């Protein structure tokens, strides 16, 4: 029970702290592409920017509500990995830039490994599936 409560706090913390970054990206996608995507040489900067923004938005919402939790964590891990790469390429191993990114990465990785816990919609769906003998859900 304490593990599930800890996972709930972790999911809510990561989701609520990270979701605004995605919304900020969508507010000025061109500026984000120019400042963050083009310097590291990713192809199709505008499309890559939209992918990053919506990965953060939808990944955060999935973590917050506990639906397809591992898929949401994987989306966040992908975006944060690119952000870590950007921070290292542009500023070197500056711990002040990397520490928050590494915390997001570590938290999302824990959710990816352990799932959403007892207080997630995923758990309710799993119990429903077992009760009615349904096939497996993706990302369990």
Say what each PLM segment does.
Residues 1-27, 46-54, 58, 65-140:
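Extended, low-polarity transmembrane helix blocks
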């Amino acid at each position: 029970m304490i593990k599930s409560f800890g996972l709930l706090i972790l999911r809510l913390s990561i989701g609520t702290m990270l979701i605004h970054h995605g919304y900020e990206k969508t507010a000025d996608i061109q500026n984000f592409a120019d400042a963050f995507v083009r310097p590291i040489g990713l192809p199709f900067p505008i499309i890559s920017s939209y992918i990053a923004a919506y990965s953060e938005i939808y990944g955060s919402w999935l973590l917050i509500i506990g639906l397809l939790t591992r898929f949401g964590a994987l989306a966040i891990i992908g975006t944060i990995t690119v952000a870590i790469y950007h921070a290292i390429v542009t500023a070197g191993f500056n711990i002040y830039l990397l520490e928050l990114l590494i915390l997001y990465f570590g938290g999302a990785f824990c959710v990816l490994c352990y799932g959403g816990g007892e207080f997630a919609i995923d758990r309710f769906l799993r119990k429903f599936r077992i009760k009615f003998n349904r096939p497996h859900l993706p990302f369990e």
